[in-house]
Amino acid sequence: MSAVVVDAVEHLVRGIVDNPDDVRVDLITSRRGRTVEVHVHPDDLGKVIGRGGRTATALRTLVAGIGGRGIRVDVVDTDQ
């Protein structure tokens, strides 16, 4: 199930951004649970987050629907 979540998020994010080759999606498992980390080109960060966080919220809703409520989605700022 986790591979399906990662593939779905990667496919959607690649469709949103201007630099699809720079998209990387990782599934991190820790004692806090599972987290899908989305790494994009710094110029595309605003597109993935969306106005008022709407796109990021939609990604989180999609992940909750596919993988259950125990998976978090983090959009990683690669500038820092």
UniProtKB/Swiss-Prot annotation:
One of its GO terms (cellular component) is cytoplasm. It holds the Pfam family KH_KhpA-B. It is found in: Cytoplasm. InterPro entries: KH_dom-like_a/b, KH_sf_prok-type, KhpA. Keywords: Cytoplasm, RNA-binding. One of its GO terms (molecular function) is RNA binding. Residues 33-80 form the KH domain. It comes from the Bacteria. Belongs to the KhpA RNA-binding protein family. A probable RNA-binding protein. This is RNA-binding protein KhpA. It comes from Mycobacterium tuberculosis (strain ATCC 25618 / H37Rv).
